[in-house]
Design a protein with these regions (language model features):
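Mid-to-C-terminal secondary-structure elements
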Residues: 125-141, 152-282
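Hydrophobic alpha-helical transmembrane segments of multi-pass inner-membrane transport and secretion
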Residues: 15-44, 283-320, 348
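Conserved transmembrane alpha-helices of multi-pass membrane proteins
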Residues: 372-405
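Membrane-proximal extracellular/periplasmic loop immediately following the first transmembrane helix
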Residues: 37-108, 115, 222-225, 372-382
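Single conserved hydrophobic/aromatic residue that forms the stacking wall/gate
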Residues: 406, 413-414
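A short amphipathic helical element positioned immediately N-terminal to and/or at the very start
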Residues: 5-14
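The feature marks short, hydrophobic/small-residue-biased sequence motifs that occur predominantly
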Residues: 101-103, 110-141, 147-148
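Transmembrane alpha-helical interface segments in multi-pass membrane proteins
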Residues: 18-29, 320-366, 392-408
Length: 414
């Protein structure tokens, strides 16, 4: 029966090629637009390596500090290593807490007597590679002993390894980082710039440089950010409460100097962090969600309403056919079943076209569509299927269009 319905649906589409093409194109447009908008949002919050645990991340990229002599003024930016350790590294509830430089810095890397190339270097602690799941192709990350000793070692990407050594098998080899010798301990898959917290091309221990001394406000502010890996999303409330207590305790120590650290309700989860652009402003998550919902509704409703009208018109053209078939014994359920199948065929064909166009557009327009408003690197963002494709989103959009196509016929039409 279903096979027969399917054949009849295809035959009906061939009988009205213009209407069929317009219906498929309109539904494909709706799928294309909603998928493209969702992709733009998903790259900010959806998990992909090396940030596969985004649903368990809490971030403290920046904070503010005030002083009794500054009035209402504040100093805003990343924190110092000391502040990060005193407040966040000491937390007991999370699975892991990593401290790292808030942004990568373009630095020359080379081999002796060879021309240098630019690489984005991020300085981290050893826990960084426990929080972020890098895919190692050679070697391994530096461990706690190496980090504490300040040994000049580095983890590099495949592209940097090939540029320097001609292959990805470079663990144990040495190169010059800003004219200082470093030894490669591991090689990882290239990381997209869309992985904002973990992106880099070279990662080194911040104990191997003088970065911890790059501070201000009496060593309370500096160049460091923190990412917390919770054991479960359910622990977020407890982690935030513990962080508040540690902040309060630390501020009581700073009171003698006249300073007060301000977290602005940090740490933020991944979704909140994705819309946070300033250290001294707390993002409005409800407003951002409301704006996205309005955009989604508009993108879905405008094409769908037009398609619904077209389906209604097509059914009215078939009133005589429906009457004859009812007169010869066709039941209401059989007629409704055929209408549903016709709409399902249209939706599936249009969905495949819309999904294909959205993926092609995302790949071809990566530099424009996924360009970050604030970025410390000149490297263009890269995307792959693990970043772009989320079947649940496509299925929801497909179901929505199908429902709107189906709801156009009224019972009296059958």
């Amino acid at each position: 029966m279903i096979k027969q319905y399917f054949k009849q649906a295809l035959a009906q589409l061939r009988q009205h090629p213009l209407i069929s093409v317009i219906s498929i194109a309109g539904t494909a447009l709706s799928i294309f637009l909603i998928m493209l908008v969702v992709m733009l949002q998903q790259v900010k919050v959806a998990p992909f390596s090396p940030e596969s645990n985004r649903d368990r991340f809490l971030h403290v990229h920046y904070m503010s500090i005030s002083h009794k002599d500054w009035g209402d003024g504040t100093s805003n930016g990343p924190m110092s290593v000391r502040t990060a350790r005193e407040i966040y590294k000491s937390l007991k509830t999370p699975e892991a807490v990593t401290i790292y430089c808030s942004m990568p810095v373009s630095t020359p890397v080379s081999l002796p007597a060879m021309p240098a190339i630019g690489a984005d270097v991020r300085e981290t602690d050893d826990t960084f590679f426990k929080v972020f799941d890098f895919r190692f192709v050679n070697g391994k990350p530096y461990d706690e002993a190496t980090f504490n000793a300040g040994t000049p070692v580095a983890v590099i990407t495949e592209s940097i390894s090939r540029a320097l050594f001609g292959s990805t098998e470079s663990a144990g080899k040495e190169f010059l980082l800003n004219h200082a010798p470093y030894r490669v301990v591991g090689v990882v898959k290239d990381v997209s710039t869309l992985a904002d917290a973990s992106y880099g091309q070279v990662w080194i221990p911040f104990t191997s440089t003088d970065l911890p001394n790059d501070t201000w406000s009496d060593q309370h502010m500096g160049m460091m950010s923190v990412t917390i890996l919770a054991r479960s999303h359910d622990d977020f409330g407890e982690i935030r409460a513990e962080a508040k207590r540690r902040m309060s305790e630390y501020n009581s120590i700073l009171a003698d100097q006249g300073y007060t650290l301000i977290d602005r309700n940090r740490p933020y989860d991944q979704e909140t962090q994705s819309i946070s652009f300033a250290a001294n402003l707390e993002p409005d998550l409800k407003s951002a969600r409301r704006e996205r919902a309005i955009i989604f509704i508009i993108l879905l409703l405008v094409p769908a309403i037009n398609l619904s009208s077209m389906t209604q018109s097509r059914l009215r053209q078939r009133v005589a056919e429906i009457g004859v078939r009812r007169a010869f014994g066709s039941t209401r359920m059989e007629m409704v079943g055929q209408i549903i199948m016709e709409n399902l065929v249209v939706t599936l064909l249009a969905g495949a076209v819309g999904l294909f166009i959205s993926i092609v557009m995302a790949y071809l327009g990566t530099d424009i569509l996924f360009a970050q408003p604030y970025s410390a690197t000149l490297n263009a963002p890269t995307v792959d299927s693990s970043i772009l494709l989320h079947p649940s989103t496509f299925l929801y959009a497909l179901l929505f269009c199908f429902c709107l196509l189906y709801t156009s016929p009224s019972p009296r039409d059958c």
